[in-house]
Amino acid sequence: MQPFRTLHSTVTPLDRVNVDTDQIIPKQFLKRIERTGYGEFLFFDWRQDPAFELNQPRYKGSQILVANKNFGCGSSREHAAWALGDFGFRCVISSSFADIFHSNAGKNGILLVKLSEGDVNTLLERAQKTQGYSLTVSLEEQTVKDGQGFSDSFEIDAFRRYCLLEGLDDIGLTMRYQDKLDAFEKEHDGKFWLAPRGGLAASRTS
């Protein structure tokens, strides 16, 4: 997972409330478990409209999505985070997020920034009116700035912040303790009453 420290990017505005996960990635595309290949189906139904934001050349290559409140509601599908990341978004800014989506996004390297409704509306308006409108999001400083006078700070769980800064998903975090895991297995491998038949090492590779 790519570490997230400071991101400077143009902004894609999505001025819609209650954007649910079925709109983010419709159910007919949830037929595999790989994390890649979903970007082309992001907001699939809405992208049938030529006027939809993601179809506009001015927003091409944007890595920051600014959306209205209650983003990511609906089902718990992790594919929603996969689709956003595969499309190229590394940060989503909104005034509120659904809890499960919030967890899924962070575990997949996407920084979710919660700002006030007033500040989100300001960013939406500026992104809609200003060609090439950009933001700088610093996870290290926990700030959002646009170089035009807008500046705000945001809160984030300390553990999630650490994982994003280090580029660690759940597996990567676990693998940092590989030496301790190996030592535990070695220590307990001879205690047959605690291990499956063949020992801990055998059970892990079976």
UniProtKB/Swiss-Prot annotation:
GO-annotated biological processes: L-leucine biosynthetic process
Q: Which Gene3D superfamilies match?
A: Aconitase, domain 4
Gene Ontology, cellular component aspect: 3-isopropylmalate dehydratase complex
Instruction: List the Pfam families hit by this protein, alphabetically.
Output: Aconitase_C
Q: Which domain of life is it from?
A: Bacteria
Q: Which pathway, metabolic or otherwise, does it act in? A: Amino-acid biosynthesis; L-leucine biosynthesis; L-leucine from 3-methyl-2-oxobutanoate: step 2/4
Cite the entry's keywords alphabetically: Amino-acid biosynthesis, Branched-chain amino acid biosynthesis, Leucine biosynthesis, Lyase
Quote the InterPro entries the UniProt record gives. 3-IsopropMal_deHydase_ssu, Aconitase/3IPM_dehydase_swvl, AconitaseA/IPMdHydase_ssu_swvl, IPMI_Swivel, LeuD
Report which reactions are catalysed by this protein.
(2R,3S)-3-isopropylmalate = (2S)-2-isopropylmalate
A GO molecular function assigned to this protein is: 3-isopropylmalate dehydratase activity
The record's EC number reads: 4.2.1.33
Instruction: Give the PANTHER family listed for this entry.
Output: 3-ISOPROPYLMALATE DEHYDRATASE SMALL SUBUNIT (PTHR43345:SF5), 3-ISOPROPYLMALATE DEHYDRATASE SMALL SUBUNIT 2-RELATED-RELATED (PTHR43345)
UniProt-listed NCBIfam families: leuD (TIGR00171), PRK01641.1 (NF002458)
Oligomeric and partner information: Heterodimer of LeuC and LeuD.
Q: Which family does it belong to?
A: Belongs to the LeuD family. LeuD type 1 subfamily.
Function, as annotated, reads: Catalyzes the isomerization between 2-isopropylmalate and 3-isopropylmalate, via the formation of 2-isopropylmaleate.
Q: What is this protein called?
A: 3-isopropylmalate dehydratase small subunit
Taxonomy of origin reads: Bacteria, Pseudomonadati, Acidobacteriota, Terriglobia, Terriglobales
